[in-house]
A protein has these predicted regions:
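Conserved N-terminal catalytic core of the sugar/cofactor nucleotidyltransferase
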Residues: 1-9, 17-24, 35-114, 120-124, ...
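Residue-level signal for inorganic ion chemistry
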Residues: 41, 97, 116, 159, ...
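Conserved core of the sugar-phosphate nucleotidyltransferase
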Residues: 122-237, 260, 310, 335
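General beta-strand structural signal in soluble alpha/beta enzymes
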Residues: 59, 82-83, 112, 143-145, ...
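Short beta-strand segments
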Residues: 10-11, 60, 111-114, 144-148, ...
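Left-handed beta-helix
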Residues: 2-4, 202-357
Length: 357
């Protein structure tokens, strides 16, 4: 019996906060930054493959990463990789997948997930996803998965719940507040982080696009009509060149009145920075996260080191540093100044062009 459950993996980002290891030619989602032996996108596929059949996956990515996707997920076919000509944030990405699924199966239920998150308690996570799928099947609802915040982080969307039910209607959805507001949210105990994982019926999200992002609805309806025809590639290129770049959070989730959240605790991290890698990495007795081979540290504490295979490094006298070495770039930066990585990238690009980016 054919399944109506589908999983859409968003895999188009370049992971600039993980520079210089994450590069335009090989971004974060295709790397094994945590040393598990598998890339982030491979972990993501395997996580959802226990819920969704291989034929019901779609991966939305930049056109230049298509071969990488197929290399890391050989279970899927070429037609399951939707290629964005240029990145336009998450709303166009999700629209491309949603209108493709609407054409294929109007009864589809969609799980939408980033490609590069860490889930430590996968059984608990899949139980929550199953509950969300059942809820979405019975209701006209847009569901997101919420995470109890541990700090006032300005990099996440925040969800205010209206009650203490397992699946609660969202009272307020605020995308990336400033620090003062994030601190207030944390103090109330009513707010959760938005994990960026969504569940809904394809009909529900298409209706939300029609209602809240009508220009995207019109454009991607045109893409849907062109699917499988000679005009498909040209239509997709035109739509992505003309459509407004906007996140699904700003474009729909903050405006819609049928948003629900299932909050959970399953060891989630978006692993968005070297600092978060340090947090989850195995450490020595001096709190250093260093490779098991080839790295010799002296009088060094609370630092993280990433080296290419076969490279030897001797490090002495560092406290709370990030050291990332690649074949052509070495970055040494205090952990407290990690937010400057994008500034470093701009400086390198200004003087050396794109070859090191």
């Amino acid at each position: 019996m054919a399944s109506n459950k589908y999983c859409v993996i968003m895999a188009g980002g370049i992971g600039s906060r993980f520079w210089p290891k994450s590069r335009q030619s090989m971004p974060k989602q295709f790397l094994d930054i945590l040393g598990t032996g598998k890339s982030f996108i491979r972990h993501t596929y395997e996580r959802f493959a226990k819920i969704v059949p291989a034929g019901n996956f779609l991966v939305v990515t930049n056109h230049k990463y298509k071969d990488l996707v197929l290399q890391h997920i050989p279970e899927i076919g070429e037609k399951q990789v939707l290629c964005e000509p240029i990145g336009r944030n998450t709303a166009p990405c999700i629209a491309y997948a949603a209108y493709t699924l609407l054409r294929e199966n109007p009864d589809a239920e969609m799980i939408v997930t980033p490609s590069d998150h860490l889930i430590l308690n996968e059984d608990d996570f899949r139980t929550i996803i199953g509950e969300c799928l059942e809820f979405a099947d019975r209701h006209d609802a847009l569901l997101t998965v919420g995470i109890k915040p541990t700090r006032p982080d300005t990099g996440y969307g925040y969800i205010q719940v209206s009650d203490d039910h397992a699946i609660s209607k969202v009272k307020c959805f605020t995308e990336k507040p400033d620090l003062e507001l994030a601190q207030t949210f944390l103090q109330t105990g009513e707010f959760y982080w938005n994990s960026g994982i969504f569940i809904w019926k394809v009909q529900a999200i298409v209706e939300a696009f029609r209602k809240y992002l009508p220009e995207h609805h019109a454009m991607f309806s045109g893409v849907m009509k062109a699917l499988g025809t000679d005009a498909e590639k040209t239509t997709v290129e035109i739509v992505f060149s003309e459509c407004r770049a906007i996140s699904i959070d700003y474009g729909i989730m903050e405006k819609a009145d049928n948003v629900y959240v299932r909050c959970g605790n399953f060891g989630w991290s978006d692993v968005g920075t070297w600092g978060s890698v340090y947090q989850h990495a195995r450490k020595d007795r001096y709190a250093n996260a260093v490779p098991e081979e080839g790295c010799y540290v002296y009088d060094t504490r609370s630092s993280i080191v990433s080296l290419p295979k076969g490279k030897v490094a001797v490090i002495s006298g560092l406290k709370e540093y990030i050291v990332v070495d690649t074949d052509d770039v070495l970055m040494i930066c205090p952990r407290a100044e990690e937010q400057n990585i994008k500034k470093f990238i701009d400086e390198v690009k200004f003087h050396n062009g794109d070859k090191h980016i």
